[in-house]
Amino acid sequence: MSSSLYHPRPVLSSQRYTPSPDYLQDARRTYHDNSRLPLRETASNAQSHNFNSMVPCYSSQVGISPSVPASLPAPMIPSQSFECLYRVPTPRNQPRFQQRRPRNEVNPLYFWPAFRQYRNRQAHKDTQKDKGGVWRRPELEDAFVDSVLLMPHMGRRKFSMGGKLHGRNMLISEYIFTICVAILGSKEIFRIDNSNDSIEQMGRKQVSSHMQVVKKFFEDLRCFHFLFPAEEKKEPGSTNSDDYYDEEEQESFKSNPVLTALAEGRVPDVKPNYEYFSQLLALQSLISVRPKTAEVYVSSSEVKFRDEIAYDAQDAPLDTESFPHLNKYNNCDDSPSVLGKDVLLHEYTRSLDRTTSACVKTVTRRWQKDAPEIYETLELPTRDEECLLLEMCATLELHEHARFPSGSELTGFVEVAITNPNLQSHRWKCVTRLTRPSELHSDDKKSSVYTNETGIHRRGCSDSKPDCDCHSRPRQDIHVPFPAVEWASILSMAVQYPDVEHQRKKEKRTKGDDRKNLDRAGSKRKRSEDDGDAASWARRDLTGSDLICKVAMYQELWSCAPDSNRWVRQGIVFWRFNTTNQWYKYNPVFKPAGTSWRWLTVNDPMSRYHQQKALVYPSASMSLDSIMSPTPSINQHMTAAMNETFSSAWDPSVSLAQVPNATATNNGLTLFESFSGGLATPPPTAGLQGSYSGSFDHGMPPSTGVGFIPSTCSTAGESHPGTGHGHSHSAAYYDAQTTLADLKPVMSTVNPYQSPTTSSGLDLSSSLVYDNAECDTGLQGWDMPALDGWSTGAGSGSEWGSHHKVEPSSDQTALWTQSQWAQMAGDRDGSPRPMKRRRGDGIDSHIPPTMTAAAGGW
């Protein structure tokens, strides 16, 4: 487990992200009454060390660090109170301080009506001991819902962690495990009695089961694929199953902070961008139209039934084997309403189902490859709020020979519902563009793209009618024109390319000779057999089904207000076609006829834009108060109390750079660790003049013993004079112009406020000498009280003194004495450098100054 779980980073109260587990109302409740908060809470002067500082994202009733005795009083400056240090959170069943949190601090998925009703039903189980909801801990439900937004979309890729390949669902399980261990200390909550599976396996099954339940509440969302991406795998030798993505557009897993944190066994420092996902959910309110009906069939008004036998116009009986759909709706009331008194000869597709959303690239990338002509005419919107995108995937049942009696007519009835009441009184028009492969052209004239623009009218009205009044009466449904003439030609040409393999399999199925040894769809074949099937599948003759899949069509729906002449594009309907004769793993299979539709988005969840926008990094919510008011150390607590009583604690004549940096050593006391150097917020006595001068004269000789050097170091400097830096270097250390952001002391544990560029104002790099050239020049100066406790080692002092020569100084002789460095290097084998730190204990030297305090809040 990462050391970051034992050495928590400081989190200011203004930054702490601690959502309460109660989502039963519109917003969750906070733990405390914020009507009157002490300085710690209101001015960001300090932060509490209680609760679960290891997991700032999820609240838990966890006390202070076990390394600190419970009876030890906490340091406190006079302007603070004990309540801010030892405040106990209110339990869920005690609505003592009920106060709604801002909506932007709650996961937006909790506000989706279907999921909210489900959570309300689950709330009744929380009060029962043996039925404590899905997770039996509300924090784990919060972690699950957040992980849906946090986990990157992986497509067909896997993330290697712990010697195993992890998919997205497995990573969600690992995230919940990490939160569970950080809050509860173990994963025992996932254990199921009388089960031989490990805790990890039981937890993954629970996550997978809960995922399937939660998915159903969001299936109608336009942004569903941003939350639950489809994990369809491309099978070789399959029909119409590949979705195209550019690998260079996908964000690398190595740079993802969530996956990096899980690989290190710690809780991620980032959180979901609730505002961004709220915008994605808001796309649902911009839906203007919704598919209602999609039927394509051939009918005839001249075919008559006599004695249950159909006769054409020449009184010739029609063969039922050639027209199997003749009697499909004779004895039922489920016949198409638009059929009227006509006789149905063949039905290509009728049923309409909805599937989950996807990115528009799944369509356009295929067109870019197979139909570049129509791809060039496509003008996609730049944002999803500008225009609605949806896809209609029609699976057609081709007729065997497509020879219909005279008087037959192909009808395509596509109807959409206008869901926006403001558009129901508009005028509507449709612009259709279609392209097909050269094999499906009936004449030598092979136009590149078929284009047709026509108005959308009520039944019985058309563009040729001069007194059209379709817009005078509101209409909830509109009939989208379908290019029936073009499709009659396409379907007639497609039957000229027969599908021998599917026909052979259909005959075997009819004769009942479909034996298992001939149907190897589910068998485990060797690689040689797969290669042979792949080669034969690639060499097979072109079929009508293959050509139908290459037909591309889209329709733009435009509307115009009655009192305006400006047309606005309301939606684009993308059409994808295939047939019932399909392939799966080089084997012919059959799929039922029907049409499925889904929402499409311009925004791609696989893109770098989304994966960077979906996360909120620690610096995103930083405030100036957080930078100027870090946590005071125990020494600063005591100094503030002493100076308030005896003298002035702040002298305006003294530069801020002269404040002594007294830091605590790494003694394991998390409550007393100095995470930063001094209060930037002056105490109440800042403006009072004390009886003793607090200034420091740089020109005072070292013999006076006045300075910011500890007495032990000063004594050693007087008794053992040595070489030191010149006055120019020491003057640069004290006289450099600094800012409040530069006042960052050295710390022995992780200091999120530390930065290598901090020394730019103090010029620390020119005033320090290290025993090794490979030492990081970005390290701060040594802490004299911490070095004073080091024991002296024999022989180490000569090695240290012989390697580096320093110039004598008139001011800082006590600081750079050779004997003093020799005493400090005793326990470090001749080097005063601190011991090697673990990953989580090192100084964050990679964080820029403007983001230093941000790292502390997460």
From Swiss-Prot:
Entry-linked Pfam families: TEA
Cite the entry's keywords alphabetically: Activator, Conidiation, Nucleus, Sporulation, Transcription, Transcription regulation
- For bias type Basic and acidic residues, the affected ranges are 500-522
User: What is an example of a GO molecular function annotated in this UniProt entry?
Assistant: RNA polymerase II cis-regulatory region sequence-specific DNA binding
What follows loss of this gene?
A: Leads to abnormally shaped phialides and abolishes production of conidia.
Transcription regulation is among the record's keywords: yes
Q: Which residues bind DNA?
A: 128-221
| UniProt function note | AbaA and wetA are pivotal regulators of conidiophore development and conidium maturation. They act individually and together to regulate their own expression and that of numerous other sporulation-specific genes. Binds to the sequence 5'-CATTCY-3', where Y is a pyrimidine, making both major- and minor-groove contacts. Plays a pivotal role in conidiation by regulating cell cycle pathways and other conidiation-related genes.
Similarity annotation: Belongs to the TEC1 family.
- The protein depicted here goes by the name Conidiophore development regulator abaA
Give the encoding gene's name: abaA
